[in-house]
């Protein structure tokens, strides 16, 4: 959940300060780093309502990246996005995973699964099943 009364920079600053960061220059540098990583450079003074849905989602991902997590859990991260924004989020997750962070995503969007095949697990009648999506799709 984004803080609607704070701009992009302040949303990220809040998380860093809440997790123990104290040095203002280090905070500023870390914010610049994650904004660059998620493609929101020059948006630091925009309010959340001034961002598109895709940009808001990128800001949420930036918040998740601030403290260099080993795992990101994403629940329907492309659910309310147009196809172009959805594709951008999926490409961003692929880049994040390529940098060594595991991304676990819950989705009902079969198009994303088809376009970005990877290890896929589904819940079926209370059971967890791993699906070989690559062979199913013929890749």
Regions found by a protein language model. Give the residues of each.
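Catalytic Walker B motif of ABC-type/P-loop ATPase nucleotide-binding domains
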Residues: 72-75
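H-loop/switch region of ABC-family ATPase nucleotide-binding domains
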Residues: 107-108
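Short coil-to-helix segment of the ABC ATPase nucleotide-binding domain corresponding to the Q-loop/switch region
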Residues: 6-14
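Hydrophobic anchor residue at the start of the ABC signature
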Residues: 61
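Conserved ABC ATPase signature
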Residues: 47-51, 55
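A short, proline-enriched helix->beta-strand linker immediately N-terminal to the Walker B motif
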Residues: 66-70
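Helix N-cap at the start of a conserved alpha-helix in ABC-type nucleotide-binding domains
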Residues: 83-85
């Amino acid at each position: 959940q984004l803080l609607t009364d704070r701009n992009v920079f302040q949303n990220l600053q809040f998380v860093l300060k809440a997790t123990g960061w104290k040095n203002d220059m280090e905070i500023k540098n870390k914010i610049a780093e994650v904004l660059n990583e998620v493609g929101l450079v020059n948006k630091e003074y925009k309010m959340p309502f001034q961002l598109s849905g895709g940009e808001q989602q990128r800001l949420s991902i930036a918040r998740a990246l601030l403290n260099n997590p080993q795992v990101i859990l994403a629940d329907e991260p492309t659910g309310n996005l147009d196809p172009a924004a959805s594709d951008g989020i999926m490409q961003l997750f692929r880049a994040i995973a390529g940098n060594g962070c595991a991304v676990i995503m819950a989705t009902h969007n079969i198009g994303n699964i088809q376009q970005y095949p990877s290890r896929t697990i589904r819940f079926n009648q209370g059971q967890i099943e791993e699906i070989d999506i690559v062979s199913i799709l013929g890749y």
